[in-house]
């Protein structure tokens, strides 16, 4: 409030809101703030991160840059509370950090249920320091450990063109074609997504690790992502 008048901006910084409903604030939202400041008639009150259809104060997002350092691999893992996905990904960070010269970063999202709720693990790896303080929305690799999510969440829309999608399921190729939403299949085809399926539960039982599908899926991630030799 003290700086704005001295720069001739009047009350342009009057009131702003962000992070409502636990929504993440991304670089694209920050860019929209600067675009607003450069506008002929900037909004003095605005909302970031959500589509504010109550007050209609949201700023338009016109670009969504990838601000992670070049060479960074960004990965998202969709799991179910207590299924071992989060624990396996925490182990993955430690394994990569201890056995490579790469930097590693992990964020973990949980819903209000401690068991049986959705979890999303956000992992980044790369040769440069990683300072991104927001969740991943441009992923090189996305894994869905619970097949019921394919009709509930837009998971593949976060995958960059040429990226990879791993789905844990029991479906045959014919069943898979019926189970996947048309929107998901279209995005995979149009963006040349590398699509893999695995029956982690069956493999875990076959190798004597019943109930440890997360370990099988972790191995699949290391194999497909080729971050460290398996």
Place the predicted regions along the sequence by residue.
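Short glycine/serine/threonine-rich phosphate/pyrophosphate-binding segments
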Residues: 85-91, 150-154, 213-215
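Single conserved hydrophobic/aromatic residue that forms the stacking wall/gate
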Residues: 2-13
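Alpha-helix C-terminal capping/helix-to-coil transition sites in glycosyltransferase folds
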Residues: 8, 137-139, 161
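Short alpha-helices
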Residues: 14-36, 179-230
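Flexible inter-domain linker/hinge segments
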Residues: 19-74
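ADP-ribose/adenylate-binding Rossmann-like module
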Residues: 157-187, 195
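Anionic-ligand anchoring segments at beta-strand to alpha-helix junctions in alpha/beta enzyme folds, i.e.
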Residues: 71-142
């Amino acid at each position: 409030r003290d700086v704005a008048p001295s720069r001739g901006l009047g009350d342009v910084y009057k009131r702003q809101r962000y992070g409502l409903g636990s929504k993440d604030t991304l670089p694209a939202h920050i860019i929209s703030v600067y675009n607003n400041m450069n506008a002929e008639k900037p909004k003095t009150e605005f909302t970031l991160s959500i589509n504010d259809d109550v007050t209609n104060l949201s700023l338009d997002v016109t670009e969504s840059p990838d601000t992670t350092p070049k060479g960074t691999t960004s990965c998202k893992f969709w799991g179910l509370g207590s299924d071992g996905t989060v624990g396996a990904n925490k182990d993955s960070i430690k394994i990569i950090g201890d056995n490579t010269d790469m930097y590693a970063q992990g964020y973990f999202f949980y819903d209000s249920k401690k068991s049986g709720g959705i979890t999303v693990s956000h992992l980044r790896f790369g040769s440069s320091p990683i300072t991104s303080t927001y969740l991943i929305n441009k992923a090189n690799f996305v894994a869905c450990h619970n097949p019921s999510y394919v009709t509930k969440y837009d998971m593949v829309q976060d995958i960059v063109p040429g990226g990879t999608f791993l789905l844990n399921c029991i479906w045959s190729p014919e069943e898979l074609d019926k189970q996947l939403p048309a929107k998901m299949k279209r995005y995979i085809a149009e963006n040349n997504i590398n699509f893999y399926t695995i029956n982690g539960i069956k493999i875990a039982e076959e190798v004597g690790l019943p109930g440890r599908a997360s370990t099988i899926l972790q191995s699949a991630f290391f194999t497909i992502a080729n971050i460290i030799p398996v």
